[in-house]
C-alpha cells in the first residue's frame, strides 16, 4: 500500500497518520481519520451507513446512523474546498457515501 495519498490540496501520510491541507496540518478526530482512510481504500465504491458503521466503528459500537453523517460532515468541513458542495466525499442519495478523490 502507498505511504501517502493526495487529493486536491489534501495529503494523507499513512505512515505518520497525518493529514495536511495546503501544507497545514489538519486535526482529525481518531474516528474521522479511520473513516477517511477507509473511504480512500474503497474509493469509487458506494458505501452504506451500515457498512461504514460496521467497518469503521466495529461490531461492539452502538452508534446511531447519524454518527456516520456527523463524521462525514466533519471531514467535509476540514478537507473539502466547499463543504456544502463536496467534490471528494459524495452523498449517494438513499444509498450512502462515495469517495472520488
Regions found by a protein language model. Give the residues of each.
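Flexible, glycine-biased helix-capping/connector loops in cytosolic signal-transduction modules
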Residues: 1-3, 15, 29
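Basic, amphipathic DNA-recognition helix from helix-turn-helix-like DNA-binding domains
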Residues: 1-6, 78
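Conserved catalytic Walker-motif region of ABC-type ATPase nucleotide-binding domains
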Residues: 7, 12-14, 99-101
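Positively charged, aromatic-enriched patches within helix-turn-helix-type DNA-binding elements
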Residues: 18, 23-95
Amino acid at each position: 500500500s502507498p505511504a501517502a495519498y493526495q487529493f486536491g490540496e489534501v495529503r494523507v501520510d499513512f505512515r505518520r497518520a497525518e493529514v495536511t491541507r495546503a501544507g497545514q496540518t489538519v486535526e482529525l478526530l481518531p474516528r474521522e481519520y479511520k473513516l477517511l482512510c477507509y473511504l480512500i481504500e474503497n474509493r469509487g465504491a458506494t458505501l452504506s451507513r451500515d457498512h461504514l458503521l460496521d467497518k469503521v466503528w466495529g461490531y461492539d459500537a452502538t452508534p446511531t446512523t447519524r454518527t456516520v453523517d456527523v463524521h462525514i460532515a466533519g471531514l467535509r468541513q476540514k478537507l473539502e474546498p466547499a463543504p456544502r458542495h463536496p467534490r471528494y466525499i459524495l452523498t449517494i442519495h438513499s444509498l450512502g457515501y462515495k469517495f472520488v478523490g
